[in-house]
From Swiss-Prot:
Transport is among the record's keywords: yes
Keyword Transport: yes
Subunit annotation: Homotetramer. Dimer of dimers. In the homotetramer, subunits assemble around a central channel that can accommodate two ligand molecules. Interacts with RBP4.
Organism this protein belongs to: Crocodylus porosus
Name of the protein described by the UniProt record: Transthyretin
Swiss-Prot/TrEMBL keywords: Hormone, Secreted, Signal, Sulfation, Thyroid hormone, Transport
Pfam families (alphabetical): Transthyretin (PF00576)
Taxonomic lineage of the native organism: Eukaryota, Metazoa, Chordata, Craniata, Vertebrata
Tissue: Strongly expressed in the brain, and to a lesser extent in the eye.
UniProt free text on domains: The N-terminus strongly influences thyroid hormone-binding properties.
Residues bound to L-thyroxine: 38, 77, 140
Length: 150
């Protein structure tokens, strides 16, 4: 039984890696998109549509100020959250409303939210793809950081 569980986790991770980080397409399709979010449903093996996303920026006094918001498309993606001009160096938090997503599917999840906190643009201007693989009782995240393409 443990082998089957590990195999399932491995296969879900494989799907996640092949779907979550297309280095070529992000830069070429969204060359003006400095921050893109992608969400995958590990239970159904598909993009997670209609997941509410909020992005916060840490202020100089340590508080979090809402910076951007959106919902994932049928492809599990949120584009155009911000512009190159507004996405300056700083600490950001991406909040995934996982509870509402799972409850809409008739499941009772453990997490209310999944958060990813990261420092952006501290080594020069970059483009970021934040990807999350969700299940009702766990989540995993990864990031693809690339130089912007003209």
């Amino acid at each position: 039984m443990a082998f089957h569980s590990m195999l399932l986790v491995f296969l879900a991770g494989l799907v996640f890696l092949t779907e979550a980080a297309p280095l070529v397409s992000h830069g070429s399709i969204d060359s003006k998109c400095p921050l893109m979010v992608k969400v995958l449903d590990a239970v159904r093996g598909s993009p997670a549509a209609n997941v509410a996303i909020k992005v916060f920026k840490k202020t100089s006094d340590g508080d979090w100020q809402e910076f951007a918001a959106g919902k994932t498309t049928e492809f599990g993606e949120v584009h155009e959250l911000t512009s190159d001009e507004k996405f300056v160096e700083g600490i950001y938090r991406v909040e995934f409303d996982t509870s509402s997503y799972w409850k809409a599917l008739g499941l009772s999840p453990f997490h209310e939210y999944a958060d990813v906190v990261f420092t952006a643009n501290d080594s020069g201007h970059r483009h970021y793809t934040i990807a999350a693989l969700l299940s009702p009782f766990s989540y995993s995240t990864t990031a693809v950081v690339s130089d912007p393409q003209e």
